[in-house]
Amino acid sequence: PDKDFIVNPSDLVLDNKAALRDYLRQINEYFAIIGRPRF
């Protein structure tokens, strides 16, 4: 299970809404510090 998590964590995150919400919160905090990327 740990190996699968390292290889493809995104699927596990998307399957868990609580984890997804926390994941997005961390990304928002990260970009708030370094500045948002240009797409």
Curated annotation (Swiss-Prot):
Q: Which UniProt keywords apply?
A: Amidation, Neuropeptide, Secreted
Listed InterPro entries: Pancreatic_hormone-like, Pancreatic_hormone-like_CS
Q: One Pfam family, please name it.
A: Hormone_3
**Subcellular location(s) of the protein:** Secreted
GO-annotated molecular function: hormone activity
Q: Which GO terms describe its cellular component?
A: extracellular region
Q: Does the keyword Secreted apply?
A: yes
Q: Which residues carry this modification: Phenylalanine amide?
A: 39
> What biological processes does GO assign it?
neuropeptide signaling pathway
What is the purpose of this protein? May have an important physiological role in neuroregulation.
The UniProt entry's sequence similarity note says: Belongs to the NPY family.
Q: What name does UniProt use for this protein?
A: Neuropeptide F
Which source organism does the UniProt entry give? Answer: Moniezia expansa
Give the classification, highest ranks. Answer: Eukaryota, Metazoa, Spiralia, Lophotrochozoa, Platyhelminthes
